[in-house]
Design a protein with these regions (language model features):
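DNA major-groove recognition helix of helix-turn-helix/homeodomain DNA-binding modules
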Residues: 32, 51-66
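Conserved binding/catalytic microenvironments
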Residues: 5, 104-400
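Short basic helix-loop element that most often maps to the first helix and adjoining turn
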Residues: 11-30
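Short C-terminal boundary/hinge segments that cap the last helix of small helical domains
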Residues: 61-77, 297
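A detector for short, charged/polar N-terminal pre-domain segments
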Residues: 1-8
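Recognition helix of helix-turn-helix/homeodomain-like DNA-binding domains
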Residues: 31-47, 69-72
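Residues in the helix-turn-helix
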Residues: 26, 37, 47, 52, ...
Length: 400
């Protein structure tokens, strides 16, 4: 069934239910969910939790992604301007197992380290056009360095290659190319295995990143399995293992989000507490471009409260927050997206738009594409009343 752009999750469920010939009571009974909750979700008065979506999808014999708007499901819009830049990245990901080109002359490891830091900074700012233009050449250079260098420089080159592969995931997941994201993270693990004492942390970080695609489709079981896998790579490590504490802390933050999606607030709080304990040990750190530390724990507290439908508590927890200089724009942007969601559910449309504007100011490409932004704008557009110029601008920006 093809539905127009901008249709909400609740409206999609209603349309697909009617197509299946089911009344609301019949679907609620088949999915084993509350009839009252189903009616409120369809009407846009309650958010659809991951567990709710999974139950309804099973009852309708559909995938969870079928109930969600793009880009939760695979594929990207036909007007995506980054499309012409994807082919060279895909080629670099595909040709990973070939020997370096004969004329390859990689720069010294110090220069390569700086180049990887710069390209990851572009990814963390959602500045995808220059990142995508530079990524294939940098991957080729790092690939050559990993094969041609020796000793500690070679191990470092493998680690840098793993970090650079992560950028393919960053753009892939942003524009709905989940297959490219998965390929990039597979190559990240391939390189990380050869990175010496950085291997455990990098491999654990890769599992943390893999969760995103499954979280977007509501497959919480897959999320938990990946997080357990990530922790297994840290077995036998200690605080001196490069990146181990950072990866462990980030896995706890990811687990807190999954617990919040499942409405398990006690488990959510446990993981946040564990992340806070590790953040006090690490401080603010840029290891693996994860930006783990006390600030990220606070950001995830707000995020998880939104996911757990504690919207007033989320807004209160965000008061007075300050971000470290140079902190990842996409992290700041996502924080404002979460606050826009909270304010939308609290029937505060102007505050929701304020946070959408703040997200756009810090990371415009992220805010323009993010499925949670599209979902929020779609809900605001259906709320009734006179449509403001700001809301109209967001409708145009997101293509709702």
């Amino acid at each position: 069934m093809t539905l127009p752009v901008g249709v909400s999750i609740g409206e999609r469920i209603g349309a697909l239910r009617v197509e299946a010939g089911l009344s609301q009571r019949a679907l609620a009974a088949r999915a084993n969910v509350s009839y009252s909750l189903l009616t409120k979700v369809e009407a846009g008065h309650k958010p659809a939790s991951a567990a709710f979506l999974a139950a309804v999808a099973r009852a309708l014999r559909l995938k969870v992604g079928d109930l969600q708007p793009e880009p939760y499901s695979d594929g990207m819009g036909p007007k995506e301007p980054l499309l012409p830049l994807m082919a060279p990245i895909r080629a670099a990901l595909d040709l990973y197992d070939l020997p370096p080109q004969e004329d390859a002359r990689p720069r010294p490891i110090t220069a390569l380290r700086l180049a990887v830091r710069r390209i990851n900074a572009l990814a963390q700012a959602a500045d995808y056009k220059p990142m995508c233009a530079a990524l294939p050449g940098l991957l080729a250079e790092l690939h050559a360095a990993a094969h041609l260098m020796t000793g500690e420089d070679q191990r470092q080159a493998w680690g840098l290659l793993a970090e650079a592969y992560r950028c393919g995931h960053s753009v892939g997941i942003a524009i709905g190319l989940n297959d490219m994201s998965a390929a990039a993270l597979s190559r990240m693990d391939w390189a990380a295995q050869r990175a010496g004492d950085r291997a455990p942390g990098l491999r654990a970080a890769r599992e943390y990143l893999r969760v995103t695609a499954y979280l977007r489709t509501g497959d919480l079981d897959a999320c938990r399995r990946l997080q357990d896998s990530g922790r297994s790579y840290l077995d036998g490590t200690d605080p001196k293992t490069p990146g181990a504490l950072v990866a462990a802390g980030q896995l706890h933050l990811g687990s807190a989000v999954v617990a919040a999606r499942a409405q398990d607030v006690d488990l959510m709080t446990h993981h946040l507490d564990e992340a806070e304990r590790l953040a006090q040990a690490t401080g603010e750190t840029g290891d693996f471009s994860l930006h783990f530390g006390p600030t990220n724990v606070q950001v995830h507290l707000v995020m998880t409260l939104v996911e757990a439908s504690r919207h007033d508590r989320a807004v209160a927890a965000a008061k007075g927050m300050r971000f470290p200089a140079g902190w990842a724009p996409t992290r700041i942007g996502h924080h404002h997206i979460d606050l826009a969601r909270a304010n939308r559910w609290m029937a505060r449309p102007e505050a929701a738009l304020d946070h959408l504007d703040a997200a756009f100011a810090v990371a415009p490409q992220q805010a323009s594409r993010h499925p949670l932004v599209r979902e929020t704008v779609s809900a605001l557009s259906r709320a009734g009343g006179r449509r403001s110029s700001r809301l109209s601008a967001w409708i145009a920006r997101t293509g709702i």
